[in-house]
Amino acid sequence: MAPPALTIRNLSTTPLELKSLERFESAEGKASGVNITRITRSLTGFMYLNSTPTSPQLAEKAESFSRQDVSIPIAPFETKVTDIEPQGNQVLRLTFETNGERYRIDTPTPLHRSTVLTPLSHNPTYEFTGVYLPKYHFLAIFSSAKLASWMSNLKDETPLAALSIPGTHNSPTYHAALPSVRCQAVSVKEQLNNGIRFLDIRVQPQDPNDPAAEGLILVHSAFPVSLTGHKYFRDLVNHVKVFLDANPTETVIMSIKREGIGKATDQQLSQILNHHYTQDSTRWFTGNRIPALGEVRGKIVVIRRFGLDDSLKGENNGTGLYIDAESWPDNCADGVCTSGEIRVQDFYEVAESSNIEKKIGYSTDQLERAAKTVAVLSEDMGVASAESAKQPFFMNFLSASNFWRANCWPDKIAEKVNPVIVDYLCRRHSETTSSEQPDSASVGDGSTGIVVCDWVGTDGDWDLVRCILAMNAKLELREKDRPSDPPS
């Protein structure tokens, strides 16, 4: 069977046109005693000077190089099947143009990871990222997000639940720990700097009967997050505050749950958080509603997966403290907290590695549900705040595990789930039918909701996070069409 022709999906807000196609032998190949790796490296070194090799290089290896001018326009959010077919061990060099500027990418990309398209002019206006899926000969292109400050592209009036938000499951479990306990590759600080905006935190009060004690030990189920000694919630909060000070356009959503083997109660946890942590309204959003982005820039938004002490239930005009997720549906494919503020996929009991396909199916189903939502956008902050409270969070946990099976520990699950979700987001998320316009409200804003991941950032691989963030593009385009200015 012949390999499929090249398909290009433009997931950016910018119209693109494929202008030229070049072919040359891949770096793995050698012919006529010529080191192709050396040649291709020299070719890619012409970042701002040339889009083609020099005459001597071309003469030296002419039989493995060809160039063709083409004109293939690709509108924002359009998927286009071309007649460009791969040929053996060749690399395809694709040059795109937008607004008179050209950008280039070689496929397959190194290590089959995302790559930033090379601008062919000084001071380029745009930055694009490409993800190439060799199995399908499929290239997805999206606007590169500034990972540390990506919320700066969105207006204050944006409903927080309308965003595509990457998150981590058991976020502080990056320390040396039991392999069934560890869920993350890198620190919370590094997670935040690379775009993570949802943190999943599990704690156990250290001295619950002492009102003056603030100690909250970070745990994962019955286990500490580190084998080298207790790690504390206070230190984690300080890291988040430092990040928000450096990036005031951002907000961090923090889900907090009581776990561990201690005898503390939910009510005691709620008292500790209220008395020792969340009193400062410039740092914390403690309302029991989903806010607009502008209400919480520079703040931590608390989702409460624990019960409140009776003394705190009268806060916020009787609605209580924090966004209510106390009635979290357990091990669910599609559940709703009784508060109505959160719709969640959190199926985590994978008895066998063969059940991972079921987990993947539940995850993509939740992505599809989130993509169909359409946010109500208003330039009036009061209206925006009220409308934001009506749109629930779609929360989608990609995590799962089985304590008793090593091939179902968090890292092994992530090895299988994460690449499939990258593939889904690039090829299928918020796809349109032939009768639908790519920017039509009938297909929704294309949001992912909050996607909660394990083991992102492994060996510097942030492709899953980048793909999630790319799905904010439709919302950004809708906001760009409105007259009000974006946040500074």
Task: Map each language-model feature to its residues.
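Well-ordered, non-membrane alpha-helical segments in soluble/globular domains
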Residues: 230-240, 266-279, 363-377, 414-427
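Long, acidic (Asp/Glu-rich), low-complexity accessory segments flanking structured domains
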Residues: 2-194, 207-246, 310, 317, ...
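Intrinsically disordered, low-complexity acidic segments that are enriched in bulky aromatics
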Residues: 221-275, 281, 288-289, 298
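Structural recognition of the beta-strand scaffold that forms the well-ordered cores
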Residues: 162-165, 197-201, 217, 252-256, ...
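Structural alpha-beta junctions
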Residues: 272-288, 335, 383-390, 471-484
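Aromatic-lined glycan-binding groove of carbohydrate-active enzymes
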Residues: 299-409
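A generic structural motif
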Residues: 254, 280-296, 397-398, 453, ...
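A cross-family signal for N-terminal binding/gating loops and helix N-caps
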Residues: 142, 203, 260
